[in-house]
């Protein structure tokens, strides 16, 4: 692949033995969702190594495709905008601008945050569903990590 993300796929059967079991709100294992035609909206199976490669690719300002994804297409408010799949925090500030995308499926949650200007990134991959009582810890961890990379 263009970014050498050899551990990422839509085909569960290719990585089934490597998957961490997803957990519901009671902490019980749940089956993976089969999203079929909606696969690109939540069916990517990946790992921290490949997500790191994806973050590093964001730092290449010559990559027109990735740069296009980060262009603001709509404004939510003064401190938040939207790109193609990215929430853009502080879109008017080159110094504090960050790009964020999170996801949830049955038994899993994830967050990726990219600071292109300072070449920093955060990846959080969890087998905790958004309805799990521990899910809020993921948001707290993300907020704490953002604060640390900004300082």
What does each of the following model-derived ranges do?
Residues 1:
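Basic phosphate/pyrophosphate-binding loop/patch that engages nucleotide-derived ligands
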Residues 4-11, 17, 24-151:
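Catalytic loop of the DD-peptidase/beta-lactamase superfamily, centered on the K-T-G motif
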């Amino acid at each position: 692949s263009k970014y050498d993300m050899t551990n990422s796929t839509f085909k569960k059967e290719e990585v089934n033995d490597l998957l961490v079991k997803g957990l519901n709100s009671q902490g019980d294992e749940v089956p993976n969702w089969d999203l079929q035609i909606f696969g690109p909206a939540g069916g990517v199976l990946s790992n921290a190594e490949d997500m790191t490669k994806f973050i590093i690719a964001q730092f290449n300002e010559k990559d027109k495709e990735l740069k296009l994804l980060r262009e603001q297409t709509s404004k939510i408010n003064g401190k938040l905008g939207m790109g193609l799949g990215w929430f853009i925090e502080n879109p008017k500030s080159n110094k504090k601008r960050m790009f964020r995308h999170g996801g949830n499926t049955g038994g899993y949650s994830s967050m990726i945050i990219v600071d292109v200007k300072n070449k920093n990134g955060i990846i959080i991959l969890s087998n905790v569903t958004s309805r799990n009582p521990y899910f809020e810890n993921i948001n707290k961890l993300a907020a704490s990590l953002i604060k640390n990379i900004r300082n």
